[in-house]
Regions:
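Glycine-rich phosphate/diphosphate-binding loop of Rossmann-like nucleotide-binding domains
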Residues: 7-27, 32
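C-terminal binding/interaction regions
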Residues: 4-16, 92-101
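Residues at secondary-structure transition points
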Residues: 12, 16, 40-47, 69, ...
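A short beta-strand-loop structural module common to alpha/beta enzyme folds
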Residues: 31-42
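Solvent-exposed alpha-helices and their adjacent loops that cap or buttress functional pockets
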Residues: 1, 56-60, 99-101
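Mid-chain, well-packed structural core segment of small domains
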Residues: 64-101
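Short, structured active-site "lid" loops
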Residues: 48-70
Length: 101
């Protein structure tokens, strides 16, 4: 994959995974826009999902990654935005298939 600009966000349950994913993608040469959250304090996941979807809609980012406790809340919130198609991806094969449909 060529280098992309990727917006990423999580709620408090996904901070550690978000940080790992961000670091990996950055090492691979992608530009990361990290919308938080940045600690384990309880937050409302829809606030963070909207930051990422707004970046995609306004073409600030090529892709978005949303992480929460189950992934469901972020995906549901993202899919409420016109033009956004979010998929719950829990392994590499599912992520690849979500991009091919």
């Amino acid at each position: 994959m060529e280098n992309k600009k990727i917006s990423i966000a999580s709620d408090h349950a996904g901070v550690s995974l978000k940080d790992l994913v961000s670091e990996h993608l950055s090492r691979e040469g992608h530009e990361i826009i990290n919308h938080g959250t940045f600690n384990n304090d309880s937050v409302d996941y829809p606030d963070y999902a909207k930051k990422v979807t707004n970046d995609i809609i306004s073409q600030v980012s090529d892709f978005g990654i949303l992480i929460c406790g189950t992934g469901q809340g972020m995906a549901i919130t993202a899919n409420k935005q016109v033009g956004i198609r979010a998929a719950l991806c829990y392994e590499p094969e599912i992520a690849e298939l979500s991009r091919s449909h």
